[in-house]
Amino acid sequence: MSRQKTLDLLATGKTLWNKWRREDAEVQAFEPDLHGADLHGMDLHEADLTEANLQEADLREADLRETDLRHADLRSANLSDAHLLRARLHGADLRGANLCRTNLQGADLSNADLRGADLDGAILDKANFDEANVSRRDLGEADPNTPLKAKEQRAGSVALLDVKAA
């Protein structure tokens, strides 16, 4: 399916999108190509974006509550001010993503790669960072009220943290 057709289908709404992803056998093996898409402010609450290519996508202020983004490619995506409450981001690639002021309360970021992601001002309350790949500098000015447990590991000259909300 062409990138434009994928965008057009997503624009019809999450209900039709999720039905299409769930019921069409050919689609179940399909990784949606939304690379560089302008999804600014879009309501994608509970959408199935599993394994989607959202690299460099504009998701500013998008409603991604409870959205399934497992194993999605979100490298260099702009998610600033997005709402990701209870979003499923297990195994997602968020390297270089802008997560400034993003609400990640209760989100599952286990096994996610967040190296180089900007989490300044992010709300991380009850977010699961189990086995996530995050460096100290990536946490920046993330919500200081979020109790995080971190286990430092060394990989070359970079200090990596396995971070998990307490």
Please state what every model-predicted region is.
Residues 1-12:
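P-loop NTP-binding cores centered on the Walker
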